């Protein structure tokens, strides 16, 4: 697992993290053991390294670096999950995570059957949800609108532009770079 060793003041480098090997913990009631399969690396993670108040608490020195993740349940002491379930949550930069399914930054959810697991970290994850709610609830494009998307080359911006077109925008202009 990778734990935060020091807080960066500029660019993030490997020196800010420490590779630590630990035994897989025994589960307590209500916990599941997840083998992490996929991690999402997002710009917001840089902000989580700063020791400032934000929409989520900062990653503390000595804590596993947080990340949106998809994994497979390998053991369960929670009746809502069984071995083999594919789940999404915030399991962090580690191979195995013992987590309580009802606590944490992101509640643990099963990835619906038929959805590629990696899509839970993109179009059906924070990226897609940010674009969806930003466009549908805030931007509210209507038939014939011209919509400008800043950051259109990024994950969220590219989805936002597509949603604008689906909602009827005549023109979608993207800023990239």
Q: Over which residues does each language-model region extend?
A:
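Conserved hydrophobic helix-helix packing surfaces used for dimerization/oligomerization
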Residues: 1, 146-147, 172
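Glycine-rich beta-strand-centered segment in the early N-terminal region that forms part
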Residues: 23-41, 49-93
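Gly/Ala-rich phosphate-binding loop of Rossmann-like dinucleotide-binding domains
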Residues: 131, 161, 165-166
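N-terminal Rossmann-fold NAD(P) dinucleotide-binding loop
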Residues: 157-158
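Adenosine-nucleotide cofactor-binding segment
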Residues: 165-177
